[in-house]
């Protein structure tokens, strides 16, 4: 068998971007044949990606694209398993590339995005290779695209864990940026009350009625109290009803009216929102591994 030298490992790593140890193992398995070692790595990296696919991806970042004229924008949520990988340059680069593809190619859904070309291969092939290189599952969760009616501002906060796009008609660039920051801070669910689901409103109403009843309020007053509670709730969760973060004496709606502007739409992404994260009990995991090892003896 040919001796596996450091220069051979370095050459294979430069060709494949695979981890050093994986390159050395592949060269050993291939008997020092570089071409065969590349094939071994392709198989192994593919297998690693398949094994990783079952693991929960609740960490990650948002990637954004904004055209120079502010008329076209896109945002992608790219997920991984750990915050460590979310800071990886290749991972960050992929998020940005995907946002650019969404803006310029306008795919219908994640499946269509995965079939687009990126660096001479499909997005899915690129993702699979990166999973193999990094050793963690990576998933494209969602994306949004805006063709502006006015001008789009983008804002990314908290290590790219929160991303905002807002399409402002009228006003100016600074107002658009301020609104994007407001959305990141106040996290509205919709532009106005019409965007809040009736199911959520009725749920808040029922809760308000029961709370008022438990507090001993007269039955005749329950509906009126509940209506007041619902209206307060709607102001809290709608962009137009919220107090503006830079001047809480006025609502966003009042601010826009004073500036002769309106919000055509906005998108808010919070990474991992709604994904159930796996909480690992380290002591229990070690005990489980020890028990499994003992059972093999």
UniProtKB/Swiss-Prot annotation:
> Which SUPFAM superfamilies does this chain map to?
Elongation factor Ts (EF-Ts), dimerisation domain (SSF54713), UBA-like (SSF46934)
Its GO CC terms?
A: cytoplasm
Cellular localisation: Cytoplasm
Task: List every stretch annotated Involved in Mg(2+) ion dislocation from EF-Tu.
Answer: 82-85
Give the Gene Ontology MF terms in alphabetical order.
translation elongation factor activity
Q: Which UniProt keywords apply?
A: Cytoplasm, Elongation factor, Protein biosynthesis
Q: Which residues cross the membrane?
A: none
InterPro entries of this UniProt entry? EF-Ts_dimer_sf (IPR036402), Transl_elong_EFTs/EF1B (IPR001816), Transl_elong_EFTs/EF1B_dimer (IPR014039), Transl_elong_Ts_CS (IPR018101), UBA-like_sf (IPR009060)
- What job does the chain carry out? Associates with the EF-Tu.GDP complex and induces the exchange of GDP to GTP. It remains bound to the aminoacyl-tRNA.EF-Tu.GTP complex up to the GTP hydrolysis stage on the ribosome.
- Can you tell me which family this protein belongs to? Belongs to the EF-Ts family.
Q: What is this protein called?
A: Elongation factor Ts
Its source organism is Azoarcus sp. (strain BH72)
């Amino acid at each position: 068998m040919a001796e596996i030298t450091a220069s051979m490992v370095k050459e294979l790593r430069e060709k494949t971007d695979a981890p050093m140890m994986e390159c050395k193992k592949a060269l050993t398995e291939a008997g020092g044949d570089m071409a065969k070692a590349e094939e071994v790595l392709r198989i192994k990296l593919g297998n690693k990606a398949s094994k990783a696919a079952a693991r929960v991806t609740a960490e990650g970042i948002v990637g954004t694209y904004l055209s120079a004229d502010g008329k076209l924008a896109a945002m992608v949520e790219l997920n991984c398993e750990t915050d460590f990988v979310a800071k990886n340059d290749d991972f960050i680069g992929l998020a940005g590339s995907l946002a650019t593809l969404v803006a310029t190619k306008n795919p219908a859904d994640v499946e269509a995005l995965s079939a687009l070309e990126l660096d001479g291969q499909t997005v899915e092939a690129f993702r699979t290779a990166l999973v193999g290189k990094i050793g963690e599952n990576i998933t494209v969760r969602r994306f949004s695209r805006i063709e502006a009616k006015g001008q789009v501002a983008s804002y990314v906060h908290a290590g790219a864990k929160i991303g905002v796009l807002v399409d402002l008609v009228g006003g100016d660039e600074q107002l658009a940026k301020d609104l994007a920051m407001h959305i990141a801070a106040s996290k509205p669910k919709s532009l106005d009350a019409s965007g809040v689901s009736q199911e959520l409103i009725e749920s808040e109403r029922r809760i308000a009625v029961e709370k008022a009843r438990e507090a001993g309020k007269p039955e005749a007053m329950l509906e009126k109290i509940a209506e007041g509670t619902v209206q307060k709730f709607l102001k809290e969760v709608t962009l137009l009803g919220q107090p503006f973060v830079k001047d809480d004496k006025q609502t966003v709606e009042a601010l826009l009216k004073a500036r002769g502007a309106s919000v055509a739409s906005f998108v808010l992404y919070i990474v991992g929102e709604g994904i159930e994260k796996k909480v690992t009990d380290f002591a229990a995991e070690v005990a489980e591994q020890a028990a499994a090892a003992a059972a093999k003896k």
